[in-house]
């Protein structure tokens, strides 16, 4: 992911056509302030999530493995955020050298893909647990979860390779600044366009469709369960949680993805207007703040859907140490729903809807 489109994907545009795109005094004040807030809140929140899941919950469930990795991925990104805050406050002047430029840039890209992939796997895990509970013990194992996380980290690293290779520190003559930006040997390189479209498709569109499909099927399964168990009161909170999960992901990322796509159109020469380029480059860091602030809250958001997570989180805040006895799972807000569609079939079918949150 890119923290400032005006100094990287749009580098050719800055040098030639629109040198002042995205360069406003209020941006140089507001964005570093927002980055600082995200850094403090994110480091504090995600560190507590890691402590609660690993030391209090004892990392006993598939969902907890995904949440732990989600928090760790966020922490890796957050550690580089002060660099970007200083970079923006200095009006996009990079004082930290080439190695930190590559490392910090790769961390941003890595976090985008790792977080989105982990959230997608978490939705698939919920789908298997609720829609196919009989197959769940076979498919949802701790080993499978850990292997999946390793694969996700490798894929995120692979997706970040272009950033490591092409992101460098160099001097822009007409603006007289040293930037940390994508630098291509040829100004006609199609790589920035490819990276932008990859971010749109692989970093948002496909994962969102999977998440939407998973929770839609979960919704239908739970609704059918409630219809069969008419004697039990319906808990609408479950459906509100499902809606919140899907909408939270969508509205966190769609603004940034829209402006990333507009930036691709500018790269392709479809959009020529410098006013539009200025709007895109000005809005880009703002949409990034929205995406990454929500992204860093994801572990807390998903974790707090479980009752035991909330219990242990409060214990940690009160300096109550974890008990020696391990806890088998994150408790759920949703009670188990069991029903038999027919008493006259070849075999009784039993389904259990486990938690939408974390199990």
UniProtKB/Swiss-Prot annotation:
Tissue expression remark: Adrenal, liver, aorta, kidney, lung, testis and heart.
Q: Which InterPro entries match?
A: ATII_AT1_rcpt, ATII_rcpt, CCR1-9-like, GPCR_Rhodpsn, GPCR_Rhodpsn_7TM
**What are the record's GO terms for cellular component?**
plasma membrane
Description of how the protein assembles with itself and partners: Interacts with MAS1. Interacts with ARRB1. Interacts with FLNA (via filamin repeat 21); increases PKA-mediated phosphorylation of FLNA.
Where would you find this protein in the cell?
Cell membrane
Any one biological process term the GO annotation gives: inflammatory response
UniProt biased composition (Polar residues): 335-352
Instruction: Give the encoding gene's name.
Output: AGTR1
What are the annotated glycosylation sites? 4, 176, 188
Protein name, UniProt field: Type-1 angiotensin II receptor
Cytoplasmic face: residue ranges? Answer: 56-61, 126-141, 217-239, 305-359
Family indicated by similarity:
Belongs to the G-protein coupled receptor 1 family.
User: Where in the chain are disulfide-linked cysteines found?
Assistant: 18-274, 101-180
Q: Where does angiotensin II bind?
A: 15, 17, 167, 182-184, 199
Which Pfam family, just one, is annotated for this protein?
A: 7tm_1
Residues lipid-modified (S-palmitoyl cysteine): 355
Instruction: State the taxonomy lineage.
Output: Eukaryota, Metazoa, Chordata, Craniata, Vertebrata
Q: What are the entry keywords?
A: Cell membrane, Disulfide bond, G-protein coupled receptor, Glycoprotein, Lipoprotein, Membrane, Palmitate, Phosphoprotein, Receptor, Transducer, Transmembrane, Transmembrane helix
- GO-annotated molecular function: angiotensin type I receptor activity; angiotensin type II receptor activity
- How does the UniProt record describe the way this protein sits in the membrane? Multi-pass membrane protein
């Amino acid at each position: 992911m890119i923290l400032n489109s005006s100094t990287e994907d749009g580098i050719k545009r800055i040098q030639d056509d629109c040198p002042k795109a995205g360069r406003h005094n209020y941006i140089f004040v507001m964005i570093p302030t927002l980055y600082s807030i995200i850094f403090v809140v994110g480091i504090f929140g995600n560190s507590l999530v890691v402590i609660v899941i690993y030391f209090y919950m004892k990392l006993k469930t598939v969902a907890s493995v995904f949440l732990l990795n989600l928090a760790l991925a966020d922490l890796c990104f957050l550690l580089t955020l002060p660099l970007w805050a200083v970079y923006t406050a200095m009006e996009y002047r990079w004082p930290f050298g080439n190695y930190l430029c590559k490392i910090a840039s790769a961390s941003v890209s890595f976090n985008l893909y790792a977080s989105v992939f982990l959230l997608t796997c978490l939705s698939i895990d919920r789908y298997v647990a609720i829609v196919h509970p009989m197959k769940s013990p076979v498919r949802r194992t701790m080993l499978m979860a850990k292997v999946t996380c390793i694969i996700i980290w490798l894929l995120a690293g692979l997706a970040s390779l272009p950033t490591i290779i092409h992101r460098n520190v160099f001097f822009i003559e007409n603006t007289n600044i040293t930037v940390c930006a994508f630098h291509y040997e040829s100004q006609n390189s199609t790589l920035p366009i490819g990276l932008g479209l990859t971010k749109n498709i692989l970093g948002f569109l496909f994962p969102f469709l999977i998440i939407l499909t998973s929770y839609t099927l979960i919704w239908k399964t739970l609704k059918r369960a409630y219809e069969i168990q008419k004697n039990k009161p319906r808990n609408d909170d479950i459906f509100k949680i499902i809606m919140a999960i899907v909408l939270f992901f969508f509205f966190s990322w769609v603004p940034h993805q829209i402006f990333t796509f507009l930036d691709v159109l500018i790269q392709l020469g479809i959009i020529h207007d410098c006013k539009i380029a200025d709007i895109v480059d000005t809005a880009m860091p703002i949409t990034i703040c929205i995406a990454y602030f929500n992204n860093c809250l994801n572990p807390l958001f998903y974790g707090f859907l479980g009752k035991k997570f909330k219990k242990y989180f409060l214990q940690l805040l009160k300096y109550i140490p974890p008990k020696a006895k391990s806890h088998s799972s994150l408790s759920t807000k949703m009670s188990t729903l069991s029903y038999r569609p027919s008493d006259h079939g070849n075999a009784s079918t039993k389904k259990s809807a486990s938690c939408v949150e974390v199990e």
